[in-house]
Amino acid sequence: MPQHKSAEKRVRQSKRRNARNRVHKAEMKKLVKTVKGLIEKSAEKEEVENAYRAAIQKLDRMAVKGYLHKNNASNKKSKLSKLVNRFSKGDAA
């Protein structure tokens, strides 16, 4: 238990931030999982590209806002684009 007022405030702040981070990371994971699922199901190319665009936008937003390190976001985007490109060429992963 915190002994000082400032430590109590830090606990409150970290709980709030942790909850916010969890929401954003869960949404990001859901979008990435959607893209991978569509690729596995061999869905329409247009549908995969729309899901891919949404995932990339979310990753970019998370990097700008500081929820995710920019290199981490870049790495995730790179892996996702490699999957999508392979899918669009006809080599379903």
Curated annotation (Swiss-Prot):
GO terms for cellular component: cytosol; small ribosomal subunit. Residues 1-23 are annotated as: Disordered. GO terms for biological process: translation. GO terms for molecular function: small ribosomal subunit rRNA binding; structural constituent of ribosome. Keywords: Ribonucleoprotein, Ribosomal protein, RNA-binding, rRNA-binding. Residues 12-23 have a biased composition (Basic residues). Residues 1-11 have a biased composition (Basic and acidic residues). The keyword Hydrolase does not apply. It holds the Pfam family Ribosomal_S20p. It comes from the Bacteria. Belongs to the bacterial ribosomal protein bS20 family. Binds directly to 16S ribosomal RNA. This is Small ribosomal subunit protein bS20. It comes from Chloroherpeton thalassium (strain ATCC 35110 / GB-78). The lineage of its organism: Bacteria, Pseudomonadati, Chlorobiota, Chlorobiia, Chlorobiales. The gene is rpsT.
